[in-house]
């Protein structure tokens, strides 16, 4: 690799790409971004709709979440604790997110290209609203969404 290419590679490795709002430069990485996904024969308006619905075993309630008008409403319904969460939710939530992300980035070529073009930058869901999926706003959160996107980016690059 030429020296200049090595320098560019090094700069990109140190690059952090923050995303959160759908209006951000990389807002399409947000689960709230309006990219429909088809999973198990059903079309979901956003990956957020799909993810929130999977918290519940009640098929009728899952369908209600699928049909709501916005990902914000879907997220609110996902926090409804008057409905019982599936017992294994904590152990399967990352698997569910992986499935949603894979569907989103496989089914939309332009999104896949955008994700692949970010390599090898670190992807960070930058928000103080979430210290599990995001960075907690201060960098101390787990940033699991960012890490799952980087994992998917690696897989898609290999499959290319």
From Swiss-Prot:
Top-rank taxon, per record: Bacteria
Keywords: Glycosidase, Hydrolase
SUPFAM superfamilies linked: YbiA-like
Gene Ontology molecular function: any one: hydrolase activity, acting on glycosyl bonds
UniProt xrefs under CDD domains: NADAR (cd15457)
Catalytic activity: 2,5-diamino-6-hydroxy-4-(5-phosphoribosylamino)-pyrimidine + H2O = 2,5,6-triamino-4-hydroxypyrimidine + D-ribose 5-phosphate; 5-amino-6-(5-phospho-D-ribosylamino)uracil + H2O = 5,6-diaminouracil + D-ribose 5-phosphate
One Pfam family of this chain: NADAR
Cited Gene3D superfamilies: YbiA-like
Cross-referenced InterPro entries: NADAR, YbiA-like_sf
EC number, UniProt record: 3.2.2.-
Disulfide bonds: none
NCBIfam families, sorted: ribofla_fusion (TIGR02464)
Similarity comment: Belongs to the YbiA family.
Primary role: Catalyzes the hydrolysis of the N-glycosidic bond in the first two intermediates of riboflavin biosynthesis, which are highly reactive metabolites, yielding relatively innocuous products. Thus, can divert a surplus of harmful intermediates into relatively harmless products and pre-empt the damage these intermediates would otherwise do. Helps maintain flavin levels. May act on other substrates in vivo. Has no activity against GTP, nucleoside monophosphates or ADP-ribose. Is Required for swarming motility.
UniProt name for this protein: N-glycosidase YbiA
Taxonomic placement: Bacteria, Pseudomonadati, Pseudomonadota, Gammaproteobacteria, Enterobacterales
């Amino acid at each position: 690799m030429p020296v200049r290419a090595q320098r560019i590679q090094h700069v990109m490795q140190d690059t952090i790409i923050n995303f959160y709002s759908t209006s951000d430069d990389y807002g399409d990485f947000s689960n709230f971004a309006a990219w429909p996904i088809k999973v198990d024969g059903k079309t979901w308006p956003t990956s957020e709709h799909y993810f929130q619905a999977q918290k519940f075993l009640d098929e009728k309630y899952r369908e209600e979440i699928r049909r709501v008008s916005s990902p914000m409403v879907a997220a609110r319904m996902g926090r409804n604790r008057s409905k019982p969460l599936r017992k294994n939710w904590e152990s399967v939530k990352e698997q569910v997110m992986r499935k949603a992300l894979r569907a989103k980035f496989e089914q939309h070529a332009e999104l896949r290209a955008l994700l692949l073009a970010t390599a090898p930058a670190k992807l960070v869901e930058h928000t103080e609203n979430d210290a599990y999926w995001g960075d907690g706003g201060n960098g101390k959160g787990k940033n699991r969404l960012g890490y799952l996107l980087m994992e998917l980016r690696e897989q898609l690059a290999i499959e290319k």
